[in-house]
Each structure stands twice: as structure tokens, then as C-alpha cells.
């Protein structure tokens, strides 16, 4: 029998809610009467091209998430729930090690981005299969200034080639796992997964994300997310 490779998604949901004014994981804050992370899982759960979901959660949260979210909402594709690490890259690495061995493509997505669309997910998989790595991003709208330590402007880059990076970040599984296996101390400053590949000289493609694909980190973001969901329901 032919071995059919899998497409997996790692949902990183280990962040705290300090900027939300909460002392617990922001992923469990209610968005239209459902936890934020439940909205995120649901998008991937409903896609035929996604075979398994790996959840990375905060320390001591595995059983809570299993009983309060996975069982309550009946998610079937969640194959593993693992605890995160000290930094985001540690959490992602834990997730990568929990992925099925027959995985060919892996998406890494923020649990706090529940407004991701299926079109972006599908395009990211196609591009990653062809190129090895791609990220969703949107062109920056504001002028960006680079300063020195004295808060003096030293350069104003052209906006034409500046992108605000989102998730999913999608990779050929063997490629991103190898990159994480060979992390160097300098990679500790990496703020996204693509940077770890970039450090090894790999090319990372960009696909257009969406300005609605926000990461919910503040109370204001929650209000915006509720309005976006309302607009989608009403077909506006």
C-alpha cells in the first residue's frame, strides 16, 4: 500500500495573558462565548487537507485543555497535546517532536490568531510543497524608522519591501526539523520560525496574509476580532 504523507499543524497556545489584563493563558479568553483557541482549532479541524493537529500549551495545562476544549467541542484531529518551553522556539520544537513520522508538510500557527482563513492555509501548503518554506505576511502600512540607542533616527527603509509577518508559517517537515535540531546560541533571538531557517541560508517565500488575521494580545484586539466575526457572519 502506498504511504500517504500527512500535513500537520502545530498550534502554539502557551502564551500568558498579561497584556490582556489576565493572569491565565490568553488562549482561554472567551471570543463570542468560545475560547479563542477553540476558534483556531476549528478552522484547521474542518479542512480536508489537514491530517493532524498538535497543540502546545502552558505548563500544567494539558489535562485542562483536553477536558475543557477538546472533549467539549469534539475535536477529532488533535493527535497530541504537549507542554511548551521557556521561549516560543522551545515550544515549537516540542511540537515538532510530537508530529507524526509520516508528516511531509507542517504548519506552525499562533493559537491567538483565530481569524485565519482557509484560503491562506491552502496557499501556504501549496507554496511550501514547491519551495520548502513560506510565511504569511502583509505589507506594512506605516512608515518604519530605525533608531540608535539614543532614540535618534538613523535610517528610514522603503516600505515597498517591508512585511508584517503573521502565521501560519509553513515548511517541509524534514527541513524545519533539521533547522531546529541545529539551532545555534545566536538563534535565541529568533522571533519566528522562518528566522531559524534563514540563519542556515534557506530561502523563505512570502504569501499574502490578511489584515484581519490579527493576533489577539490586547483587550482592543478582542473587540476587533468580535467585529470581524460579526462581519463574516453577515456576509459584509
Curated annotation (Swiss-Prot):
Pfam families in the cross-refs: IspD
InterPro entries membership: IspD, IspD/TarI, IspD/TarI_cytidylyltransf_bact, ISPD_synthase_CS, Nucleotide-diphossugar_trans
Keyword Transferase in record: yes
Record site: Transition state stabilizer: 19, 26
Pathway(s) annotated for this protein in UniProt: Isoprenoid biosynthesis; isopentenyl diphosphate biosynthesis via DXP pathway; isopentenyl diphosphate from 1-deoxy-D-xylulose 5-phosphate: step 2/6
Site (Positions MEP for the nucleophilic attack): 159, 215
Enzyme class: transferase
Superkingdom per UniProt: Bacteria
SUPFAM superfamilies cross-referenced by the UniProt entry: Nucleotide-diphospho-sugar transferases (SSF53448)
EC number: 2.7.7.60
Record GO biological process: isopentenyl diphosphate biosynthetic process, methylerythritol 4-phosphate pathway
One of the record's GO molecular function terms: 2-C-methyl-D-erythritol 4-phosphate cytidylyltransferase activity
Catalyzed chemical reaction(s): 2-C-methyl-D-erythritol 4-phosphate + CTP + H(+) = 4-CDP-2-C-methyl-D-erythritol + diphosphate
UniProtKB keywords: Isoprene biosynthesis, Nucleotidyltransferase, Transferase
Task performed by this protein: Catalyzes the formation of 4-diphosphocytidyl-2-C-methyl-D-erythritol from CTP and 2-C-methyl-D-erythritol 4-phosphate (MEP).
Protein family membership: Belongs to the IspD/TarI cytidylyltransferase family. IspD subfamily.
Protein name: 2-C-methyl-D-erythritol 4-phosphate cytidylyltransferase
Organism of this sequence: Alkaliphilus oremlandii (strain OhILAs)
UniProt gene name: ispD
